[in-house]
């Protein structure tokens, strides 16, 4: 049977009018079908929900949600595309078979071939229009901050995905409708498509990913993202590190694995995962991949800690993180509504101690709504850097002045109280001395003589003990040149909130986060200026130079004051030592002569015994004095050593950067009373795993890792087209041979 009998009849005006009339009739029937509008609207609504509504409310990157390797958002839309294809196929191809219209048309007007292609044209026009509207909806994601290139890829992916899959499902339905009724055909198609589209998600919960296979064999993969020092808007490729680690499982300890080449490790243990091999028969992944073309594809958005398909990892070359990056993002958790970012600060332009090396933007509590910044939120923003740094520097110097004024007032108060106390002690001492010089009773001369000898001995022993310690309180000496952090933090936070007043709590939290990141960049420039005398041309160092000048001036004043106090203490200590030695040698002789005049009845043996005791006490005093001198010498050496170390400290820089470090790492809390629960937003730039991440960064190597598709996207699209055309031919022959009731 020829496709068109009497082809020349097509040129006949009557035949042409009949074809056009039938074409318009089918279009009108479709337009009047409210069910078809509902299903098409559902497809558009789901696209808007995933790519517009959810990102707008959650402040998440729509492209990140769409290209997630496990939670494939297109899986939610594909079943509704199948439903849309089912409804329109019923309206165009199937319903006429049941209402008797088809037998009328075939027997009196057209051949089945003409009828099939006329209906196919209507089907294609309607599906193309729906695909165009879907792409138009998706193009609105550009208003949410997505780059033009990624939006273009997303629009084309959605357009071709809706178009090809709708045609594919329609052809499948035409074929199976030859054997089943409408209800059975629809249920079979929808059930099969739903199971296929969610195959990847289902397998993700039942099969070990390659990363777990690596861990079982003693290797820990970490996935990183970076922002390069080029300060461009583009985000570089993914970094990955393979870290050889101890295996806690006794079964795995038996395996002696010694490998240093990350490519060999991944090839042996990563790609051997069953999840990788099931890619070849995972039909759901093939149809889902139509919605993630070019920059959205898996081989450009892979994460070694998650499941990914159709991707071969290539460890290209080692990366010098100190020279290449400002931030490296540890993607610890990459789920739909629970994301956590950490940022590694390189050490080549920041002091190791004053500033934290790990920065995190996190919201405490998994049950709370997350605020996750996009990469553009942590880019260098010169106007913001300049503004935040000026506020910070001005607040630093004002806090320093306030603190010094408070310290001066406190010291004056302490000196006044000490003077009053010394005056009171002096009066009490005079009273005691006047009482002790009164004449003693002659009958108690022996007892008094013994007491005087004992007191002179104890005075000689205690003279060294009463000497003030040579080393002063160095922490007090140096720490007084400091900043009152509590007042600084309160003042600085107030200024920042005043700048962002009028915003919602959520937006204010995001702005404060950007301010913290801007301050990080400013501190990096300030450190370059401090250390290398490099002017960035962005920040103004006027306030910082004032702070440094005042800081060093105050430190010099305290140094001179401390030196004067120390010299006075040394002189006083020397006078006390000389007076104590004189008392030890003179007083016993005077007392003995007085005792000899008053009591001449003492025998010679008692005198010799007493002399021997005095000699023994004198030797003990000398020993104690030598010991105290040794201790004093040690104290002097320690003090000199501490002074030398203190001179090497960049004191102004320490105060400045330490204050900045505390503020960067301190949490910034925001509370918002919502309709259902209180929302809490916490902004801080310090990760609890700082030490762990520092060790990872210090002891392991980083590599450029690129993804290479196992099967190219062009091949995938070509295969889907071939399958669709094959099913189209099959549906044509099935339609030709269908019995008419």
From Swiss-Prot:
Residues 404-423, 445-465, 555-573 have a biased composition (Basic and acidic residues). Its main location: membrane. Residues 404-473, 555-647 are annotated as: Disordered. The chain crosses the membrane at residues 34-54, 76-96, 120-140, 156-176, 187-207, 655-675, 715-735. Residues 424-439 have a biased composition (Polar residues). Residues 623-643 have a biased composition (Acidic residues). GO terms for cellular component: plasma membrane. It is a multi-pass membrane protein. It comes from the Bacteria. Keywords: Cell membrane, Membrane, Transmembrane, Transmembrane helix. To M.pneumoniae MPN_333. This is Uncharacterized protein MPN_335. It comes from Mycoplasma pneumoniae (strain ATCC 29342 / M129 / Subtype 1).
């Amino acid at each position: 049977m020829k496709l068109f009998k009497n082809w020349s009849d097509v040129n006949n005006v009557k035949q042409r009018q009949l074809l056009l009339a039938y074409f318009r009739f089918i279009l009108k029937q479709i337009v009047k079908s409210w069910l078809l509008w509902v299903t098409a609207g559902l497809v558009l609504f789901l696209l808007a929900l995933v790519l517009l509504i959810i990102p707008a409310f959650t402040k998440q990157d729509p492209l990140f949600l769409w290209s997630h390797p496990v939670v494939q958002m297109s899986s939610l839309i594909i079943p509704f595309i199948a439903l849309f294809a089912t409804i329109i196929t019923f309206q165009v191809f199937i319903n006429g078979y049941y209402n008797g219209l088809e037998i009328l048309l075939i027997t009196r007007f057209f051949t089945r071939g003409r009828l099939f292609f006329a209906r196919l044209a209507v089907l294609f026009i309607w599906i193309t229009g729906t695909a165009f509207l879907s792409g138009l909806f998706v193009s609105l994601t550009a208003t949410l901050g997505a780059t033009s290139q990624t939006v273009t890829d997303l629009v084309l992916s959605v357009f071709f995905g809706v178009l090809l899959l709708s045609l594919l499902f329609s052809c499948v339905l035409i074929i199976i409708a030859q054997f089943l009724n409408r209800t059975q055909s629809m249920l079979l198609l929808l059930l099969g498509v739903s199971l296929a589209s969610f195959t990847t998600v289902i397998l993700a919960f039942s099969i070990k990913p390659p990363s777990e296979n690596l861990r079982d064999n003693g290797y820990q993969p970490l996935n990183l993202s970076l922002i390069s020092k080029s300060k461009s808007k583009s985000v570089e490729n993914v970094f990955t590190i393979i870290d050889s680690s101890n295996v806690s499982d006794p079964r795995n300890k038996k395996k002696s694995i010694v490998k240093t080449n990350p490519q060999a490790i991944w090839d042996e243990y990563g790609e051997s995962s069953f999840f990788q091999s099931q890619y070849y028969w995972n039909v759901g992944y093939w149809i889902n991949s139509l919605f993630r073309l070019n920059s959205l594809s898996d081989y450009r958005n892979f994460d070694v800690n998650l499941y990914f398909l159709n991707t071969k990892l290539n460890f290209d070359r080692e990366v010098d993180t100190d020279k290449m990056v400002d931030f490296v993002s540890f993607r610890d958790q990459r789920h739909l509504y629970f994301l956590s970012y950490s940022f590694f600060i390189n050490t080549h332009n920041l002091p190791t101690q004053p500033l934290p090396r790990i920065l995190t933007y996190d919201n405490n509590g998994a049950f709370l709504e997350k605020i996750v910044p996009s990469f553009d939120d942590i880019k260098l923003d010169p106007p913001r850097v300049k503004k935040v740094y000026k506020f910070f520097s001005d607040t630093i110097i004002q806090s320093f002045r306030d603190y010094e004024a408070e310290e001066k007032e406190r010291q004056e108060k302490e000196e006044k109280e000490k003077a009053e106390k010394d005056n009171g002690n002096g009066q009490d001492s005079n009273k005691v001395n006047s009482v002790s010089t009164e004449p003693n009773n002659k009958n108690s001369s022996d007892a008094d003589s013994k007491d005087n000898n004992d007191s002179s001995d104890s005075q000689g022993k205690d003279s060294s003990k009463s000497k003030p310690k040579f080393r002063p309180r160095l922490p007090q000496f140096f720490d007084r040149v400091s900043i009152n952090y509590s007042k600084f933090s309160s003042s600085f936070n107030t200024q920042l909130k005043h700048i962002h007043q009028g915003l919602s709590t959520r937006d204010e939290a995001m702005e404060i986060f950007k301010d913290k990141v801007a301050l990080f960049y400013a501190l990096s420039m300030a450190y370059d200026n401090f250390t290398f005398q490099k002017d960035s041309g962005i920040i103004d160092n006027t306030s910082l130079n004032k702070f440094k000048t005042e800081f060093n001036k105050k430190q010099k004043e305290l140094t001179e004051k401390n030196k004067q106090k120390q010299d006075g203490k040394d002189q006083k200590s020397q006078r006390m030592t000389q007076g104590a030695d004189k008392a030890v040698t003179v007083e016993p002789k005077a007392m003995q002569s007085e005792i000899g005049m008053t009591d001449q009845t003492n025998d010679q043996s008692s005198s010799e015994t007493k002399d021997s005791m005095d000699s023994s006490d004198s030797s003990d005093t000398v020993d104690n004095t030598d010991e105290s001198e040794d201790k004093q010498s040690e104290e002097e050496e320690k003090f000199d050593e501490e002074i030398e170390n203190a001179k090497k400290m960049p004191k102004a820089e320490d105060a400045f950067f330490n204050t900045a470090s505390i503020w960067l790492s301190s949490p910034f809390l925001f509370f918002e009373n919502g309709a259902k629960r209180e929302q809490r937003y916490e902004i801080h730039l310090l990760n609890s795993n700082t030490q762990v991440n520092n060790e990872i960064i210090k002891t392991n190597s980083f590599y450029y890792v690129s993804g290479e598709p196992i099967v190219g996207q062009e091949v995938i699209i070509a295969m889907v087209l071939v399958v669709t055309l094959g099913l189209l031919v099959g549906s044509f022959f099935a339609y030709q041979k269908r019995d008419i009731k």
